[in-house]
Amino acid sequence: MIKHTLLMPFFFSALPAYAGLTSITTGYDFTDYSGDHGNRNLAYAELVAKVENATLLFNLSQGRRDYETEHFNATRGQGAVWYKWNNWLTTRTGIAFADNTPVFARQDFRQDINLALLPKTLFTTGYRYTKYYDDVEVDAWQGGVSLYTGPVITSYRYTHYDSSDAAGSYSNMISVRLKDPRGAGYTQLWLSRGTGAYTYDWTPETRYGSMKSVSLQRIQPLTEQINLGLTAGKVWYKTPNHNFNGLQLGLHLKWQL
């Protein structure tokens, strides 16, 4: 606990002195797996700041994974930079490090490129490298498109994964976001389906087979500066040994500054 407390001053001091803080978010996520697959708890704090053409994100998370008689705790720090190069090119660079446990990926690096080449259309491509507990490494390449039609944003993304000790795998994800007629609130739905090398958990069985998931999120403004986020979802795993599922619940508060 002392180590985690000492990380907080560094977390806040990581912002450049000239950066303009735009939001602070705190949240909690919980996943309960069926059968004897345990559960996962995650609490986090997040800062977003604006520096000229760049948007900076800093996130500090504390997680716990319980599985039968095994219990794991870990801390993760991550950062990301969105940079708007011009009216049609935006990039996102992200990096994260965590304790060497099954709770989080030990190392995570991603680079995304967003191209606004057509009106009301955004193309995305990118690469992600992830190193998990027990030195499992995954390379991922993704491409997708988002369409903006009035209050609705519809997105599709395809991702191909290469794992260091499992066959290649893939995922397809569709999301639909509906903005409220007035205010900053919105509701978003995610649907995904794919094979399992990228769904790494600390048990090797989750690296094989297939999965599908559904998630629904509601962002509800409470005041002009505070938004409440509520998320509920479910994921189904089909592995060579047996099938199981996970129920996901999340809550966060975001202060706009």
Regions from the PLM with identified roles:
Residues 1-23, 52-55, 88, 257:
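Cleavable N-terminal export/targeting peptides
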Residues 18-30, 49-58, 91, 187-190:
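Transmembrane beta-strand segments of Gram-negative outer membrane beta-barrel proteins
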Residues 20-25, 38-40, 244, 254:
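Beta-strand-dominated lipid-handling architectures at cellular/organellar boundaries
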Residues 29-44, 59-80, 94-112, 116-249:
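Outer-membrane beta-barrel translocator/channel fold
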Residues 47-49, 81-82:
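Short, exposed beta-strand/loop patches in secreted or surface proteins that constitute
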Residues 52, 84-86, 90, 118, ...:
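Residue-level recognition of beta-strand termini and adjacent short loop/turns
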Residues 83-89, 203, 256:
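Short linear interaction motif-like sites in intrinsically disordered regions of transcription factors
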Residues 177-178, 253-257:
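Short beta-strand-to-coil "C-cap" segments at the C-terminal boundary of structured domains/repeats
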